[in-house]
């Protein structure tokens, strides 16, 4: 189970025990109690997708210890096992794999986020750490979720190991969210800096994770099936913790063990769509021009078994169960929340108002116009309308507090130079939406957090807000509009109520996208 979430001023180092909520203010009591419960639910979601237990449920040895069973497949072990991995959850996955398979493990290389070993040690998570004399070499890199020289060294070491394997060898590949940044190996003559700049430009213009990964794969030696190709003819078992909506194998960490289905024309279409084709470096044009003659063909991945071992849906199911234990009527709306963060925030604001009206039908007329807009917006965001309608009907029948859960990965179009992440920006936008008009005698809280514990280039997982955000920010002379225009949500939440609305978890050792909680509690 993940360490209990802590909420504390962002400029302080997270202590080993939860920090108290700060000065006792009577009118804040109910909000703080709700926030404590929301943090418990977020913590339970993260705890459900810890890497070790998930890997242990997937792998098993026969009584002789000479056969490895993975789902319905069996592999012979003859001290012929090699291991590579990359991602935010891979340290714990590798530790679990080593515990089970150490006698057969010849060599391993993993690429994990900078500082994660120290963070796990500090949190007392010994089960997430490799043994002192492990055969697995650990590289830490990709500081602030960005590929760097350390991650490049790790990727090239992984490539070298894979290319040295034979038909008698077995390669266990561990993949989780964050793996793409931790496995950068640009095709020469493209440099890491050129590839990183192109990715940054695309992200700033609102490119989806699928579009970003299409470009990354086209310019990478290892993504888009490249790692599988490098390991051929060895057998490859790829265990994947999904951080992508719908769990598409070819998208998670840019699909290093899955043949790419995208062509150069797909890449050019994306670059044209975001107005970047004319600005491409000569090296990128060179690689794209010759890519069609040397694709990672489907035939190169027939020796690979890809297995999803965990996802956002598993995390939300556990949060729902815990919410019901706490006395909430809890429902999961979607595990596919995506789209522009402003539209997603508008959806949650409308949902809160419509749900509040359903909870207090005697005090307000049903907001038919807003309910119609809610359904239209759900369609725009590709959310199941039937599921939304069933949730609203359940809210209307509820005789107590309600918790609506969702997961996914909205996108932010960067237009300023501030500091923040999509979870903090979403929370700030939702806070504005909640304050547009009174919600009646109901306390409403919204929380958005990244299950990896790192929201963008910050040291926090996300943030939470209530419907009094606008008035409280005004009382503290904080300008929400300017913060949003400058994409400066982190700075805002650092200053707002002394940083107590930020979610501090530290690196969690896992990653299954984001968790959103909307709590409605009748007063």
Curated annotation (Swiss-Prot):
GO biological process, alphabetically ordered = fructose catabolic process; protein phosphorylation
Q: Where in the cell is it found?
A: Cytoplasm
Q: Name one GO cellular component term.
A: cytoplasm
Modification Phosphoserine, positions: 60
Q: What is its main location?
A: cytoplasm
Q: Is ATP-binding one of the keywords UniProt gives this record?
A: yes
Its recorded reaction(s) are:
(R)-glycerate + ATP = (2R)-3-phosphoglycerate + ADP + H(+)
What tissue expression does the UniProt record report for this protein? Answer: Expressed in the hippocampus, callus, brain, cerebellum, renal cortex interstitial cells, epithelium of interlobular bile duct and skeletal muscle.
Q: Which residues carry this modification: N6-acetyllysine?
A: 200
Under the GO molecular function aspect, what terms does this record hold?
Answer: ATP binding; glycerate kinase activity
UniProt keyword Acetylation, yes or no: yes
Q: Which PANTHER family match?
A: GLYCERATE KINASE
Task: Family membership, please give it.
Answer: Belongs to the glycerate kinase type-2 family.
The molecule here is called: Glycerate kinase
């Amino acid at each position: 189970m993940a360490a209990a979430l802590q909420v504390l001023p962002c400029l302080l180092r997270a202590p080993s025990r939860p920090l108290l909520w700060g000065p006792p203010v009577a009118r804040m009591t109910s909000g703080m109690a709700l926030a404590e419960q929301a943090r418990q639910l977020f913590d339970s979601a993260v705890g459900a997708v810890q890497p070790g237990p998930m890997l242990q449920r997937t792998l098993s040895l026969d009584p002789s210890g000479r056969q490895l069973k993975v789902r319905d497949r069996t592999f012979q072990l003859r001290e012929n096992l090699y291991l590579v991995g990359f991602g935010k959850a891979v340290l714990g996955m590798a530790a679990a794999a080593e515990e089970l398979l150490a006698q057969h493990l010849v060599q391993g290389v993993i690429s994990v986020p900078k500082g994660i070993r120290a963070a796990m040690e500090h949190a007392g998570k010994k089960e997430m750490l490799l043994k002192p004399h492990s055969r697995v070499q650990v590289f830490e890199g990709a500081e602030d979720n960005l590929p760097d020289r350390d991650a490049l060294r790790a990727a090239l070491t992984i490539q070298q190991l894979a290319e040295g394997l034979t038909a008698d060898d077995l390669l266990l590949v561990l993949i989780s969210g964050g793996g793409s940044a931790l496995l950068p190996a640009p095709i020469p003559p493209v440099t890491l800096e050129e590839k990183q700049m192109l990715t940054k430009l695309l992200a700033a213009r609102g490119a989806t994770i699928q579009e970003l990964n299409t470009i990354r794969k086209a310019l990478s030696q290892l993504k888009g099936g490249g790692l599988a190709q490098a390991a051929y003819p060895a057998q490859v078992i790829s265990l994947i913790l999904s951080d992508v909506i719908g769990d598409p194998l070819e998208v998670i960490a840019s699909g290093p063990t899955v043949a790419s289905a995208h062509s150069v024309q797909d890449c050019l279409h994306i670059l044209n769509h975001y107005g970047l084709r004319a600005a491409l470096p000569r090296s990128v044009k060179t690689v794209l021009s010759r890519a069609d003659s040397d694709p990672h063909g489907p035939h190169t991945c027939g020796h690979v078994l890809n297995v999803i071992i965990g996802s956002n849906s598993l995390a939300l199911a556990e949060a729902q169960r815990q919410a019901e234990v706490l006395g909430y009527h809890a429902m999961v709306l979607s595990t596919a929340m995506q789209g522009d963060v402003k539209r997603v925030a508008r959806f949650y604001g409308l949902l809160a108002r419509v749900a509040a009206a359903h909870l207090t039908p005697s005090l307000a007329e049903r907001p038919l116009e807003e309910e119609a807009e809610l359904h239209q917006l759900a369609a725009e965001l590709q959310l199941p309308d039937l599921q939304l309608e069933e949730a609203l009907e359940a809210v209307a029948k509820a005789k107590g507090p309600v918790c609506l859960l969702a997961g996914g990965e909205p996108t932010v179009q960067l237009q300023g130079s501030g500091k923040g992440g999509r979870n903090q920006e979403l929370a700030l936008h939702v806070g504005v939406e909640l304050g547009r008009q009174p919600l009646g005698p109901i306390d409403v809280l919204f929380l958005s957090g990244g299950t990896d514990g790192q929201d963008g280039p910050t040291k926090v997982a996300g943030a939470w807000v209530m419907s009094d955000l606008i008035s409280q920010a005004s009382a503290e002379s904080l300008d929400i509009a300017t913060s949003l225009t400058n994409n400066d949500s982190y700075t805002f939440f650092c200053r707002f109520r002394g940083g107590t609305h930020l979610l501090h978890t530290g690196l969690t050792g896992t990653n299954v996208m984001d968790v959103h909680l909307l709590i409605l509690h009748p007063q």
